[in-house]
Amino acid sequence: MEMMVLLSQEHPELPSAELRSVLMSEGIDFSVIESGSGYEVIDAPRSTWKILKKRLAYAHEISEVIGYAAADDLDDAAEEIDWSKYVRESFAVRIRKLCGDVDSRTLERTIGAIIKEDTGLKVDLEKPWTLIRPVLINDRFILTRRLAVISKEHFNQARPHKRPFFYPGSMSPKLARCMVNLSGVKAGDRILDPFCGTGGILIEAGLMGVRVVGADIDWRMVEGTRENLQHYGITDFEVIRSDARDLRLDEKVDAIVTDPPYGISASTAGEKSEKLYREFLDSAHSNLAEGGMICMAAPHYLDLESLIDERFSIRERYSMRMHRSLTRVIRVIERV
């Protein structure tokens, strides 16, 4: 089935990378039909939308593609569609303009009238059973039926200051979810965050059914992470006090997802960043299964490429400007 995923435009690359990583990690047979700023059209099994709804962070909606039409020919194209295949009980038509401009209100009424005449069903602008979503891209429409909305409620409610245990400097739940997805794990896999802090990354992984292991050198963070995980109903976890550089697990993990502390702080015992990262990579190699991925954040001023040796390969790299003096760089690194 052809489906359209409306992506967040908070970053030019991360949303698309996250989508494709989830599709691959879930073993879904898919192909990319079309991609652009704010969207991708893929061909995948129908059940795919349920997986994407549960996992994606940087996405808005998932829709079934009904057809394509020139911007000035949408009403004629709508006349050719058997709407009884797509509309049930009640419906609404709402145009989304990614690029370009049209008289949305007039077109929505026109298409709505066509559907109503074809099906005899009522229009419900408040809570429609079916939402028909024509998406304008330059001079054409992709005509879709919405299947799912990616809820933002969790990302608002799980912000660091709303958790039982809070400590400044924690990563946003949306970026944490994205990084877990970029690591290529799926439900049942096991991940490690050796700088777990307040547990934000582990929370997002645990909510997706991933088994989580966390470590931190600070007992306050260890206890706080346990409290936060339990608050979100996550039970399959292990959180231990350990220096990330000395950590040796009995069982290798499928991925490591982490946001190591920047610069010099108590949690790094005053060590310089380069030395900390180099020793962390030694530990990561011991704890990560062959072919497993590390998805980690680092400040732009750290030349991590110079610290990577033949044991690892950098697969992806994304920069996120945080403020004037800091850009966060997300890297996906494979253990070879």
From Swiss-Prot:
Compartment(s): Cytoplasm
Stored SMART domains: THUMP (SM00981)
E.C. no: 2.1.1.213
Record field: catalytic activity: guanosine(10) in tRNA + 2 S-adenosyl-L-methionine = N(2)-dimethylguanosine(10) in tRNA + 2 S-adenosyl-L-homocysteine + 2 H(+)
Cellular component per GO, a single term: cytoplasm
EC class name: transferase
GO molecular-function terms, A-Z: tRNA (guanine(10)-N2)-dimethyltransferase activity; tRNA (guanine(10)-N2)-methyltransferase activity; tRNA binding
Record family assignment: Belongs to the methyltransferase superfamily. Trm-G10 family.
Keywords: Cytoplasm, Methyltransferase, RNA-binding, S-adenosyl-L-methionine, Transferase, tRNA processing, tRNA-binding
Record-linked CDD domains: AdoMet_MTases, THUMP_AdoMetMT
Residue stretches making up the THUMP domain: 50-147
Protein name in UniProt: tRNA (guanine(10)-N2)-dimethyltransferase
Species of the source: Methanothermobacter thermautotrophicus (strain ATCC 29096 / DSM 1053 / JCM 10044 / NBRC 100330 / Delta H)
